[in-house]
Amino acid sequence: MLHIKDLIWTLYFIGAAVALEVNIVPDQGEISLGESKFFLCQVSGEATDISWYSPTGEKLLNQQQISVVKNDEYTSTLTIYNVSSQDAGIYKCVASSETEGESEGTVNLKIYQKLTFKYAPTPQEFTEGEDAVIICDVSSSIPSIITWRHKGKDVIFKKDVRFVVLANNYLQIRGIKKTDEGNYRCEGRILARGEINYKDIQVIVNVPPLIQARQIRVNATANMDESVVLSCDADGFPDPEISWLKKGEPIEDGEEKISFNEDKSEMTIYRVEKEDEAEYSCIANNQAGEAEAIVLLKVYAKPKMTYVENKTTVELDEITLTCEASGDPIPSITWRTAHRNISSEEKTLDGHIVVKDHIRMSALTLKDIQYTDAGEYFCVASNPIGVDMQAMYFEVQYAPKIRGPVVVYTWEGNPVNITCDVLAHPSAAVSWFRDGQLLPSSNFSNIKIYNGPTFSSLEVNPDSENDFGNYNCSAVNSIGHESSEFILVQADTPSSPAIRKVEPYSSTVMIVFDEPDATGGVPILKYKAEWRVVGQEKWHARYYDAKEVSAESIITVTGLKPETSYMVKLSAVNGKGLGDSTPSQDFTTQPVKGEPSAPKLVGHLSEDGNSIKVDIIKQDDGGSPIRHYLVNYRALNAVDWKPEMRVPSNSHHVTLKTLEWNVDYEVIVVAENQQGKSKQARLSFRTTAKPTATTATSASTGLGTGAIVGILIVTFVLLLVVVDVTCFFLNKCGLLMCIAVNFCGKAGPGAKGKDIEEGKAAFSKDESKEPIVEVRTEEERTPNHDGSNQIEPNETTPLTEPEHPADSTATVEDMLPSVTTVTTNSDTITETFATAQNSPTSETTTLTSSTAPPPSTAPDSNTVQSVQATPSKAEVPTASSPPPTSSPKVAPLVDLSDTPTNNPSKAVANQAGALNPSAATSAAEPPTAIIKPVTTVPANTTSPPPTPEPKQVKQEQSGTKSPEKESAQPSTVKSPTEATKDESASLSNTKPLQGEDFQIDGGTFKTPEIDLAKDVFAALGTATPAAVASGKASELVSSTADTTVPPDSAKTEKTQVEENSKPEETDVKSTPAEVKTVPNEATQRNVNESKA
């Protein structure tokens, strides 16, 4: 217990003794310049004051840089901001107490400099090849150790002598390369403090530019709208910039003629001209330096005339023509005229022309100039690039020069021109004189003067000897004058030619002669050859053109008889007349030798160059006429001959076309007659070279051949369509009508009149080319009239049907029952009468109608004489009897108003076949038949134009026969069955005529192509068909026995036939024809007996 008390008291006394103890935390301090640091002062015991004192002993107060803060009664804090070297030293913390006194504590503040890089810029750039020094300045309070590292390694260990660390710790790289480029680390170390710091420095190695021209020399041609590209290739680091200079002057981007690519390595010059020729520099520049390359642009130029001059001088003077030209290479200059070239070294012997050449210039000197030197001179400059030519005009003024024939021939009464051709510049005034008297004058009324630009003609019409003689032509201009005498001489007929040789053949003679010695002053126009048979007085003559025979001086007389003696003589003909004849020479033609002589060939190449006209001149025919010529030809380089051609003997030439260009050809012609062939006549020629195609200089709107042919075809097709449509609507015929009937079910053209028409006529052809008349009376009944369906006729409907045995009655009833068949002085025309309106005919009846004019012996125009018919042919009056001059005044049954009206036919009188007048009063009114005249062509007429109908009926062509001969011929009769079996009438012949209108009681309807024969008109008293065929109108003739027929009787027949076709007017010659079959023998026999 005692011990515890002692311990407590001991501790108490110890604590009282150390109550003002001062402790500074941290007890020491080191700080780098610029850094901040604080110290904490702790006091043990109760202190009334705690203060801080600087190393200099000054009490520190609370300041901006040094802060003193008393935290509580026991602690105080000293803070030093941004220390500097002056702040180093011992700082003291003092604690004081009133009872205890003072107590202090100290701390030593050490200040040092931290390792820093004072100057180490990055990047650092160097030029390749130089000694580079990499700068790195290090700052520290105590020395530091500096090392350099590159790519993670110390450069010292590279063992590269180029790397050296200098004394100032800089790194030197000798001859730095582009491969040395990169990051270098500068590292500092302080061993005492273990401090380390580093700095990475980027090293850039710049490479100087290198530049090279792709082409050192570039060639171009000026004025050819060319473009040229100049280019350079540059290299370096960094990439160099390129610029261009021309003759040391910068070329700016944006000039009109120049453009650059993106990096300016290429420069394009447009529309190169000679002025663009120069040295161009391309310069590459970067931080390492610059480089330059030279490009030479050589511009060649076509020659161009720079100077020419037109000149004028006087005859006999001297002048020099100068021509200058530019171009590269230097052009050579030559001279030429329109007719020849003048060389640069040319110098005539007399010194008339001298040519001297200089660089880019040439001079042409003309001495003693003549008027013929005037004209156009061409200066031609040429070099390898091209040629330029320019004309200059050289004008020579000279005195008049008179040209023309001095002697002129004519004769009295023949006007002649004396022409004075005047050459002068300037133009001259021309005057005419006769015996010193100016013409024209009142004393010379037969003289006229005609003036032209370069001539003056004096027309003299001599009427006496005084008009012949001298005439003077005088011409004057500003340079001088000249006159000339012209002599007008009276011409004479030529002298006789001289026969040198006479070479006879079988039918020709060849006369070789010499031209007359004297032409009489005027040209020989013709030669006259005269010949006669020896012993006869009559001379035969023929004229030959002097131009044709003068070339070879040979005349060939043709048309002679073989083995005959002849006399021949020649004479010449000029403008005045026929000259003297040569003495007659005898010769004898040779016997017939058979084959002809080879013809003579003359070729005329055509303008197109690849065709030729070969004239074939007939020679001796060998005594028999030449039948034809055999023509063969081929190209000489070809083996085969072209197909042989036969040319008629009356042809005088043959044309060979579409030959090859620029090829040699040979032609062989052989004449052939009945006796054989002649020898070969040969002709060789060469075609011209194929012309080059030229392009039209102006726009042409002409059409090609194909377009023209196409237009013509389309026009023709459209025309056919228009005609076909017109025929369809007007005449109910044509292709459209055929399609409508056969495919569309349209009624045929005869459907309109089937209920109105009471008789139809169809016109067909048989082998005898005679028309067949079918007549159906309204009393007849056919299978189509029994109320059943009627069959419309069409193009395929047969014309005839097999004859029904039960039908034995005559199918034709005349208006006068006593007569059914009438025979007249006419041709026989066979027509078929349909027994049903719209069905094929079942029987045929042959009637005879007149195609000849009626005889002139008719007693009256309205009288019909009754003639008894006999079984034999009726007596035929003369066919040449003229028609009567008067016409009956009766109403016409047939309207032929569309036919030609000239020479209208009169009423038929004195008909050979007449109606029986006694039957007219007793017979009932006959059924009305619808009749249409057939448009026929007489056998003896000229070729008529084709009719509009598609089916043309052919008329039998027969020669003119006398009535006497025709009456002696027996009648030809065919049975009805034979007529039925006759198949010569083809389907085309049985087609109905369309478009023909009938008027019945004012109604109009169409009928097929069916016509009644002319003899039906004769039977009914109308005009003969011959009158219709010749364009003459027909009129109805009364069928009664009275000599006069009242008009009312004719008017009872209301049927009027309108004929649409207009037969061409022709001269008809009657040809008696044969009578053909009648339907049954009983009717035929009765008719014949009545005629008898």
From Swiss-Prot:
GO terms for cellular component: axon; neuronal cell body; plasma membrane. Residues 754-784, 1050-1068 have a biased composition (Basic and acidic residues). Residues 20-705 are extracellular. Disulfide bonds join C41-C93, C136-C186, C232-C282, C323-C379, C420-C473. Residues 860-871, 968-978, 1080-1092 have a biased composition (Polar residues). Keywords: Cell adhesion, Cell membrane, Disulfide bond, Glycoprotein, Immunoglobulin domain, Membrane, Repeat, Signal, Transmembrane, Transmembrane helix. Residues 820-832, 839-851, 917-929 have a biased composition (Low complexity). Residues 724-1092 are cytoplasmic. Residues 754-1005, 1024-1092 are annotated as: Disordered. Glycans are attached at N82, N219, N310, N341, N417, N443, N472. Heparin binds at R149, H150, K151, G152, K153, K158, K159, D160, V161, R162. One of its GO terms (molecular function) is axon guidance receptor activity. Residues 493-592, 595-691 form the Fibronectin type-III domain. Polysialylated by ST8SIA2 and ST8SIA4. Polysialylation modulates cell interactions by confering both attractive and repulsive properties that are highly regulated by ST8SIA2 and ST8SIA4. Polysialylation is formed on a-2,3-linked sialic acid of core glycans. It is found in: Cell membrane. Residues 1-19 form the signal peptide. Residues 20-108, 113-202, 208-295, 303-397, 400-489 form the Ig-like C2-type domain. It is a single-pass type I membrane protein. It holds the Pfam family Ig_3. One of its GO terms (biological process) is synapse organization. Its main location: membrane. This is Neural cell adhesion molecule 1-B. It comes from Xenopus laevis.
